[in-house]
């Protein structure tokens, strides 16, 4: 890494102007993200010092769905108690091994230890809480920046605290992170430069200064990093490789030519709005029905004040017909609203992988139904899994390997993701195996003449073709014939040996008689 010391000589940094330029392109995406946050988790898009309430209106379905899906994705892509990746070598890494006379199979144990060390390093950086928060932002806002400082825990940076710039193909060109730091956190030389840049303005140690960190792509896999306090250059200019970049800008999905991503909530904001609207109607209707009013007949003989102030079980003088309780009778009107609300809630449950919301309402729900529904919901996220394997899991794995040792670079090692889309593929293969077993046992229910008419080899091949199942553990026709031939030969040898064994005593007795 090459460092260049930046000294303040009256020059102003251009980073704040770049921030303003890129912020204009971010504005429409940020406005939409704040709208979606009101339907789900409002606190995600609150600025520091905002007095806005964090209550999400009249419903909690959006918050429940977002929290559930965020935790679900974190558990699937980054499962506890085991590594989400395994270490593999690139072509260059294998060549280095060959030059040293080593074999790849000899390093399996070493790679396992490296994976464990990398996972421990990530755990010490508290990456799991940050990952859950990242998924919440991606679901609601569509964008989030995963930041790894030089020391301490990783953090999920909301989209209103950073800006990005991409080319038409979506490749990242610029990232600017905005942080507010107290003046006393800077070293004395930097603090003096900041005060000089402010034209002698006396600053207190607790005054906050806007610290911009700008990462600019320099080509050939390298990035330049500069910092400025307001518009005053501070620190050093660094040149680092891509895998050492402390930023991972993430998106849920992104259209061609756009710098910013779009969230899952955008696709289903209509459903969330209807849930909000109907929940408000239900709550207001229930409040009206809970409001008790009494009608007093004009000229009644009942003492109204005594009636109002009397306790439970107290004797009151009066006529029952003088006082009447007003009932709105709106319960029947709320019933269809509740039914429609349940339909929309189930639709949100399907998208946000909430199995309990999508399961049919019945006394007996079979295990097959539960497994089928869970698999369908997982498959709906297949595209998201494959995207995050490249944009999130692989860079985080490289971070862990970098923490384990500087020699683990992208030129030599290639982390292979073993969760998410890979695990989903293995689950589908097991499902095919279960279907194969089911169809193979099906002919046993047929009449005996039909069973005798089956060519079992052809039937097995036909079933495998229908369910597109590759079962490498099944023996081929040639292997079956070879085994049958070996068994027949073994039987012949056994019979021959048995015959010889029986004949030997007779031969011996005959020789003894002749002798």
Swiss-Prot record:
The UniProt record lists the keyword Protein transport: no
Name of protein: Portal protein
Gene Ontology annotations of biological process type: symbiont genome ejection through host cell envelope, short tail mechanism
Recorded GO CC terms: viral capsid
Compartmental location: Virion
Organism: Enterobacteria phage SP6 (Bacteriophage SP6)
Biological function: Forms the portal vertex of the capsid. This portal plays critical roles in head assembly, genome packaging, neck/tail attachment, and genome ejection. The portal protein multimerizes as a single ring-shaped homododecamer arranged around a central channel.
Subunit record text: Homododecamer.
Family to which the UniProt record says this protein belongs: Belongs to the podoviridae head-to-tail connector protein family.
Gene name for this UniProt entry: 30
């Amino acid at each position: 890494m090459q460092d260049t010391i930046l000294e303040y000589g009256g020059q102003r940094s251009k980073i704040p102007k770049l921030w303003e330029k890129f912020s204009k392109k971010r504005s429409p995406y940020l406005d939409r993200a704040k709208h979606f946050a009101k339907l789900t988790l409002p606190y995600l898009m609150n600025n520091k010092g905002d007095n806005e309430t964090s209550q999400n209106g009249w419903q909690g379905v959006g918050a429940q769905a977002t929290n559930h899906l965020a935790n679900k994705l974190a558990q699937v892509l980054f499962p506890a108690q085991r590594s989400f990746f395994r270490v593999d070598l690139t072509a260059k890494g294998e060549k280095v091994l060959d030059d040293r006379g080593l074999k790849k199979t000899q390093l399996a144990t070493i790679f396992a230890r490296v994976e464990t060390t990398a996972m421990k390093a990530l755990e010490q950086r508290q990456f799991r809480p940050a990952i859950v928060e990242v998924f919440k932002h991606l679901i609601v806002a569509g964008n989030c920046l995963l930041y790894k400082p030089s020391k301490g825990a990783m953090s999920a940076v909301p989209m209103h605290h950073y800006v990005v710039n991409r080319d038409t193909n979506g490749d990242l060109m610029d990232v600017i992170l905005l942080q507010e730091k107290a003046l006393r956190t800077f070293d004395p030389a930097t603090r003096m430069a900041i005060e000089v840049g402010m034209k002698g303005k006396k600053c207190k140690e607790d005054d906050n200064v806007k610290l911009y960190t700008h990462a600019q792509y320099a080509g050939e896999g390298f990035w330049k990093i500069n910092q400025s306090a307001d518009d005053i250059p501070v620190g050093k200019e660094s040149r680092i490789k891509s895998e050492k970049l402390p930023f991972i800008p993430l998106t849920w999905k992104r259209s061609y030519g756009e710098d910013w991503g779009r969230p899952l909530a955008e696709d289903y904001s209509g459903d969330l709005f209807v849930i909000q609207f109907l929940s408000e109607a239900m709550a207001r209707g229930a409040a009206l029905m809970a409001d008790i009013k009494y009608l007093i007949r004009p000229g009644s003989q009942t003492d109204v004040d005594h009636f109002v102030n009397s306790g439970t079980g107290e004797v009151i003088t009066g006529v029952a017909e003088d006082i009447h309780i007003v009932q709105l009778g709106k319960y029947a009107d709320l019933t269809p609203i509740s039914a429609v609300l349940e339909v929309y809630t189930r639709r949100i449950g399907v998208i946000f992988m909430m199995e309990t919301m999508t399961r049919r309402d019945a006394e007996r729900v079979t295990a097959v139904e539960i497994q089928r529904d869970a698999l369908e919901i997982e498959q709906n996220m297949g595209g998201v899994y494959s995207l995050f394997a490249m944009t999130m899991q692989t860079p985080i794995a490289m971070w862990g390997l970098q923490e384990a040792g500087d020699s683990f670079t992208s030129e030599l090692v290639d982390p292979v993701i073993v969760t998410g889309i890979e695990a989903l593929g293995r689950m589908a293969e097991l499902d095919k195996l279960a279907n194969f077993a089911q169809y193979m046992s099906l002919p046993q229910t047929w009449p005996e003449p039909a069973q005798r008419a089956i060519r079992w080899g052809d039937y097995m091949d036909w079933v495998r073709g229908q369910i597109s199942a590759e079962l490498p553990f099944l023996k081929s026709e040639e292997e079956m014939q070879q085994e049958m031939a070996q068994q027949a030969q073994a039987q012949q040898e056994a019979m021959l040996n048995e015959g010889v064994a029986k004949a030997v005593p007779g031969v011996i007795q005959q020789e003894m008689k002749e002798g």
